[in-house]
Amino acid sequence: MPRKGTQPSTARRREEGPPPPSPDGASSDAEPEPPSGRTESPATAAETASEELDNRSLEEILNSIPPPPPPAMTNEAGAPRLMITHIVNQNFKSYAGEKILGPFHKRFSCIIGPNGSGKSNVIDSMLFVFGYRAQKIRSKKLSVLIHNSDEHKDIQSCTVEVHFQKIIDKEGDDYEVIPNSNFYVSRTACRDNTSVYHISGKKKTFKDVGNLLRSHGIDLDHNRFLILQGEVEQIAMMKPKGQTEHDEGMLEYLEDIIGCGRLNEPIKVLCRRVEILNEHRGEKLNRVKMVEKEKDALEGEKNIAIEFLTLENEIFRKKNHVCQYYIYELQKRIAEMETQKEKIHEDTKEINEKSNILSNEMKAKNKDVKDTEKKLNKITKFIEENKEKFTQLDLEDVQVREKLKHATSKAKKLEKQLQKDKEKVEEFKSIPAKSNNIINETTTRNNALEKEKEKEEKKLKEVMDSLKQETQGLQKEKESREKELMGFSKSVNEARSKMDVAQSELDIYLSRHNTAVSQLTKAKEALIAASETLKERKAAIRDIEGKLPQTEQELKEKEKELQKLTQEETNFKSLVHDLFQKVEEAKSSLAMNRSRGKVLDAIIQEKKSGRIPGIYGRLGDLGAIDEKYDVAISSCCHALDYIVVDSIDIAQECVNFLKRQNIGVATFIGLDKMAVWAKKMTEIQTPENTPRLFDLVKVKDEKIRQAFYFALRDTLVADNLDQATRVAYQKDRRWRVVTLQGQIIEQSGTMTGGGSKVMKGRMGSSLVIEISEEEVNKMESQLQNDSKKAMQIQEQKVQLEERVVKLRHSEREMRNTLEKFTASIQRLIEQEEYLNVQVKELEANVLATAPDKKKQKLLEENVSAFKTEYDAVAEKAGKVEAEVKRLHNTIVEINNHKLKAQQDKLDKINKQLDECASAITKAQVAIKTADRNLQKAQDSVLRTEKEIKDTEKEVDDLTAELKSLEDKAAEVVKNTNAAEESLPEIQKEHRNLLQELKVIQENEHALQKDALSIKLKLEQIDGHIAEHNSKIKYWHKEISKISLHPIEDNPIEEISVLSPEDLEAIKNPDSITNQIALLEARCHEMKPNLGAIAEYKKKEELYLQRVAELDKITYERDSFRQAYEDLRKQRLNEFMAGFYIITNKLKENYQMLTLGGDAELELVDSLDPFSEGIMFSVRPPKKSWKKIFNLSGGEKTLSSLALVFALHHYKPTPLYFMDEIDAALDFKNVSIVAFYIYEQTKNAQFIIISLRNNMFEISDRLIGIYKTYNITKSVAVNPKEIASKGLC
């Protein structure tokens, strides 16, 4: 926070937030980093940011938003928090040498002292460590912070250490320090105005210090932990909202604390992007509407042209059927001749001999394969048997280890029991000597007490003699009774001693039997537990053995089903992929169909009608070229629009037809005149291996290639004009060159091209394949259905995979449980047998140790007799003693002040005498029973040692057995490995034999094929077959001339091939010929514009392109708009949630501090808190509501403190430093604030500088600051401790 006279640091932390120090940790004026997201302060930077468009994707923008900051600490009881233990100042400001300030209390510490003594230097020292600039510590530069006085001059540096630790609060002032949580942060300033930071003695940068303190909850960003002198009332006086981008009001202050301020910048970015996308979308929408209007205008002519092409296609189909019918009839005749040839079969002796040899070789190889398979099966069986042996040995190993574990545990228990028995032996041996010492010591003490009793009785008698006149009668009666009581006392003591001795003898006599009964009870309980465990595990094994086969069977079925489903999924995915490619190819084919103009359309119509045969079509439509060369060939080849015909005569007929119909003019290429170019079409050597355009053209009919050479000649294509220039002007020859951009260099040297538009689209990139739009729609529907089915299969597969995983897990768990329970059954059986034996032994021991009934009865009768005797004597003595006490009490009441003290001494001595008598009796009983107990303990030692030897032998035997099992297992593993090593060689031999067998089979098949070929080579039928084949060839040629027109976006339809059944159904081919004539007549009557199809298609493609662009930008706009709305809602929700918590706590705090006032944070605009900001309104007690600016100094202070404590409730900070926050408060309010700090904020450490006694008197720790000889010193006291000792 700033010093006096400045704006409050909580309201202006952006301006005061210091930049980080240099990377090496040394700087001339280091200070904290400003909070993230608020680093740009100059206006120019803000303007630049607003002008530049953020082109990041929506995902990148959303991912760049940091998450809400986690709380560094909580208000929960028992939660750890940070506290300052003490501060060490070394030559800092007024502190010379090393001065320790503290220790500070975990809750409430007050710093007091006279003005000018250096109180504020305590906070300056903390600001110095926390990285504030020298100006913020009331100094011009860092070197001024070094102490300088008459006694201490020329000091080169000053250092401040702030020591921290993390604690967990307990009741009262107590707390628990979290282990290894202590650390300290120090900063050293030197004379050259540089400073360095250390954390626990290690040199660090300020960034490291800041991260460490922030991680422990110290709010360096908002400085809420620091309120300096004179600024407390200004915290609540912030404006509702900052007036500029870099100003901060109450709204921005709360936003940063709540954490929703991180969303402000992304919201601005998304808002700007939505505005820009709306503008772009409007442009795209206008383009769509324009293209749609143009497309609709062409639809009528397009439909007429399609009808014409459909009729022509029907003519071609019927011609195709007639030709196929003739081919089918000829093929039937050829098939009949082939049947005759097959009947003629020559015996081939050589082939049969070879076949017999191969058959014998196959038998031999089959025998070798069977022998090898026997070896392979034998080794495999051996490996499996060894694996089963290893599994059995592994189970035995588990059982032996369980037994060994039990025996080892038993040995340890016996060792402990032996140690205890030996200790008892030593104890019983020492009992007689100890008891005699006790008797001697007690007797000596008893004698001394008797003497002391006589003295005290004499003193009592003397006192009573002095009071004889007043109590003479009572005294005589009391003396008489006391004499009588003394006679009874000796009898009571003797009777009690006899009774105690008799009772001890009875207890000792019965102790061994009672111990045996206790051991038997424990053993029976262990036996019951072992039996129940064994029963449960056997039941579990039966249950698992029943469920495991079912689970395995279900798992196998599900795995097979999953495998089948996986294969089905793969097939469907492949099918969908192939179908998708076909659909895309069909759509592309429809989009690439070109229309023809009126002239070309009319010429093609004549061709279809048969009136002018020999017409091929437009040259550009008869070939294809890569899209890369589209501009080049469209620019340099004007002949692409020429019409190709068979001969010049046909070309002349076409010219005459155009003249008669007055349709227009056209240029024709006659193929009969193109043969002269055949020799020049071969590949040639070109400069720089530049490609020749002619070589790049693809054609369906090779006759057309001559026409393309006529049109292109040796024109070369270059990447750019520079290359074209180099290639065109060669020394020995000039070339005609065209660039990819359409620029042409002629052989004469002239150059053409350039301009704003280029020519393209006169030749397609692929040969046209006709397909209908209906077929495309069917393919798309099929693709959609197959995709849905693939998705369903995928979902079924996921569910099945989950079921298989669960079944595998269940199977594995059952197998492990079965193996573990099976291995433990034997151990439990042995344990049950052992416990049965132990119970029997203990039952025998109980019987053996059973006391003699007569002796027990005799001892019990002795105890009863002595007790009766004691009760009778005690009753008589009790009556006398009661009478003595009555008389004594009567006398005491009369002479209470004079006799009470003396009587108390006498009573105390009597009590000690009774204790001595009891001790002597117990010691005598112990001496009598020591020998008997010693013998029992020694017997127990011998039994335990024998059991230990037996157990050790059992451990050795089990260890040897375990070693033997391990050796057997190692041998089994060795044999298995040896067998597995030999397995690959035999497998390889087996594979080689199978391969040889396969070769023999292939040779045999080849021999059979040769035999069949020889049989078919009969010359007597070849002449007839050749004649029919010649006719078939003719009709095939006629079919090859037929091609269907591509119509709209339908897939290009291939000429259909009729099945034999369809061809058999044709009875009269002449009727089809008549139908063809009728269709041709209809076509001749129509006058369509075939170019309308291409024009309509172009407009439709453009329309779909524009619609796709519009959909794309609409989707993008909607995505950004939705993200914008979501972020605004998230920001509002986060802010209002924190706002309600803070304002409710503020109201509660203010009411408590003012004893009846009211305060709240109000939304200036209730619909949008971010538009006008937050207003702080206050109603002091017994006053009306007022704005914060209209309050007195004390009222502002209370309001600010209420807000500070409300923010602490919402976002706790472990430390608070406050400098004279009570300066503007009266006596009453100071007490209220002090009491509130003491009682309500128990989860934070408050260090307050105060001169008000009703503030610092209530604190838990006082830090006194005073100055002598220009040096500040300190002393820490605990006011409550001083008050409890009565020192103040």
Curated annotation (Swiss-Prot):
Biased composition (Low complexity): 39-48
Expressing tissues: Widely expressed. Higher expression in testis, colon, thymus.
CC terms in the record's Gene Ontology section: chromosome, centromeric region; condensed nuclear chromosome; condensin complex; cytosol; nuclear speck; nucleoplasm; nucleus
Residue spans of biased composition, Polar residues class: 1-10
Coiled-coil residue windows: 272-588, 767-1020, 1109-1129
Predominant location: nucleus
UniProt modified residues of type N6-acetyllysine: 381, 679
Subcellular location: Nucleus; Cytoplasm; Chromosome
Modified residues (Phosphothreonine): 39
All copies of domain SMC hinge, residue ranges: 613-727
Biological process (GO), any one: positive regulation of chromosome segregation
Chain intervals for the UniProt region annotation (Disordered): 1-55
Gene Ontology terms for molecular function: ATP binding; ATP hydrolysis activity; chromatin binding; single-stranded DNA binding
Key words, A-Z: Acetylation, ATP-binding, Cell cycle, Cell division, Chromosome, Coiled coil, Cytoplasm, DNA condensation, Mitosis, Nucleotide-binding, Nucleus, Phosphoprotein
Modified residues (Phosphoserine): 22, 28, 41, 50, 143, 982, 1056
Chain residues that bind ATP: 113-120
One Pfam family in the UniProt entry: SMC_N
Family designation: Belongs to the SMC family. SMC4 subfamily.
Free-text function comment from the UniProt entry: Central component of the condensin complex, a complex required for conversion of interphase chromatin into mitotic-like condense chromosomes. The condensin complex probably introduces positive supercoils into relaxed DNA in the presence of type I topoisomerases and converts nicked DNA into positive knotted forms in the presence of type II topoisomerases.
Domain notes: The SMC hinge domain, which separates the large intramolecular coiled coil regions, allows the heterodimerization with SMC2, forming a V-shaped heterodimer.
Subunit structure: Forms a heterodimer with SMC2. Component of the condensin complex, which contains the SMC2 and SMC4 heterodimer, and three non SMC subunits that probably regulate the complex: BRRN1/CAPH, CNAP1/CAPD2 and CAPG.
Listed name of the protein: Structural maintenance of chromosomes protein 4
Record organism: Homo sapiens
